[in-house]
């Protein structure tokens, strides 16, 4: 017999990073999609469901979201396909605060192929490749006020978020090379061209900042 291991609600969001718009439709629309995603992060998961599972430890959980299970790493970014991308910004910082510490249990899972570390570095810069088969990095929110990438072509790519903090975790606006930027993603070429990605941070969600049309990240069924 074929055997498939499943982790319930988290697996629903794990399987389709290439077509989030299609998944939203299959789940009955944005309202239901967001509601179930909210539940994943906020639910109380009884210990009996993971205490004998070698891949899941309490330190790796945010609700029912298992950050220690690397194929789930794109899930906090899925709000970018909805009218509530600010929730990505909230949960990213929550995950980084809980899962990455300078302590004996400071990593919320084993670092398979360096993925736990790679997620942290990219998410600290404010973006992540939700669908690696494309050239897009979906925007979240930086964790650090300044990061600089030295590119192999001799150029540099900088990320600035001067006021970012646990309180100021929300993105008010974004600029790319000094110009207002409305897309929910940047591309590999944007990075390789060099330049500066600037995030204006605030303590309250900017609920008017949503991504529609071509500003929304890639989905197979809508591209």
PLM region spans:
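Acidic/His metal-coordination segments adjacent to aromatic residues that form catalytic metal sites
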Residues: 1, 53, 100-102
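Single conserved hydrophobic/aromatic residue that forms the stacking wall/gate
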Residues: 2-9, 13
């Amino acid at each position: 017999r074929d055997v498939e291991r499943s982790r319930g609600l988290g697996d629903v969001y794990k399987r389709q990073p290439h077509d989030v718009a299609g998944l939203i439709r299959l789940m009955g629309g944005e309202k239901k999609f967001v509601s179930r995603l909210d539940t994943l992060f906020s639910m109380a998961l009884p210990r009996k469901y993971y205490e004998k599972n070698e891949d899941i430890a309490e330190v790796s959980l945010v609700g029912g979201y298992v950050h220690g299970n690397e194929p789930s790493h794109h899930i906090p970014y899925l709000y970018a396909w909805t009218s509530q991308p600010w929730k990505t910004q909230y949960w990213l910082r929550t995950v980084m605060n809980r899962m990455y510490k300078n302590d004996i249990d400071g990593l919320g899972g084993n670092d398979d192929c360096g993925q736990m570390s790679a997620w942290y570095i990219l998410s600290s810069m404010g973006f992540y490749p939700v669908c690696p088969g494309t050239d897009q990095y979906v925007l979240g929110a930086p964790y650090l006020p300044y990061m600089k990438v030295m590119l192999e072509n001799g150029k540099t790519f900088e990320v600035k978020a001067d006021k970012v903090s646990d309180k100021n975790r929300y993105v008010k606006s974004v600029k790319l090379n000094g110009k207002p930027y409305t897309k929910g993603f940047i591309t590999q070429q944007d990075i390789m061209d060099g330049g500066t990605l600037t995030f204006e941070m605030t303590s309250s969600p900017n609920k008017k900042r949503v991504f529609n049309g071509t500003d929304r990240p890639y989905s197979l069924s809508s591209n």
